Regions:
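Unchanged
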Residues: 57-148, 189
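Acidic, metal-coordinating catalytic segment for phosphate/diphosphate chemistry
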Residues: 1-30
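Entry beta-strands of beta-propeller and related beta-repeat scaffolds
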Residues: 33-34
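Nudix hydrolase/Nudix homology domain
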Residues: 48, 116-201
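Hydrophobic (often cysteine-bearing) scaffold residues that line and stabilize catalytic clefts
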Residues: 19, 59, 63, 151, ...
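Short connector loops at helix/strand junctions that flank enzyme active sites
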Residues: 20, 45-47, 52, 102-106
Length: 201
């Protein structure tokens, strides 16, 4: 059984939890900047976060193929699947999505593109347009100062580590609970949002 309005790549586990496997990409420009998406919770408009490009793995796709497709759809950037680095990281995430708790098993890759590569959101699906706000380039060193949520939470440190290359170690973060009940206070995010806007484009 599919995950209701979540999309066709979601299924229901025996306990009713919506679940999918996903592939994600940490994208670096040749200038060292990193590409992130920003999204919001439609049911909690005050909650906004940054996350990596990526999404569900479709039937017949490998994680690498899914990562390339998602990068094209969400950011308008095309890369050869063979130039992706990794997988560099895996994790299981539990989070709120369209008013329910879901679980997603994720595998991460690295991609490198020319500095200043223009991004496009023309390929966003209806589901993505319902919660995604923008795709933008960040200076890697600035991520540590962001007080909005970032997923995974370890991303700022990982970006600093991977910016100069990957040492071949696959990091396994295990299960990470990102539901609202354990999230950072919304007031902290709201207070910082004005200073973040425009700083990272």
């Amino acid at each position: 059984v599919s995950g209701a309005n979540l999309g066709p790549d979601w299924e229901r586990l025996p306990d009713g939890t919506a679940y999918r496997q996903a592939a994600r990409v940490v994208v670096f420009g040749d200038d060292g900047r990193v590409l992130l998406a920003r999204g919001h919770d439609a049911d909690q408009p005050e909650r906004s976060w940054y996350f990596t490009i990526g999404g569900g793995i479709e039937p017949g796709e490998s994680p690498r193929q899914a990562a390339v497709r998602e990068l094209a759809e969400e950011a308008g950037l095309w890369v050869d699947p063979q130039v992706l680095v990794g997988p560099v990281l895996t994790r299981q995430a539990r989070f709120d999505f369209f008013a329910e708790t879901v679980r997603q098993d994720e595998v991460f890759f690295l991609a490198h593109v020319p500095a200043g590569s223009a991004v496009s959101t023309d390929g966003w699906t209806a589901v993505e347009r319902g919660f995604m706000d923008e795709v933008c380039w960040w200076e890697a060193g600035d991520l540590a100062q962001v007080t909005r949520e970032i997923f995974p939470a370890q991303l700022p440190a990982l970006v600093r580590q991977w910016r100069s290359g990957w040492d071949g170690t696959v990091i396994h973060l295990g299960l990470q609970d990102e539901r609202t009940t354990i999230a950072s206070p919304a007031t902290t995010r709201q207070a910082s949002s004005a200073s973040e806007e425009g700083h990272h484009r």
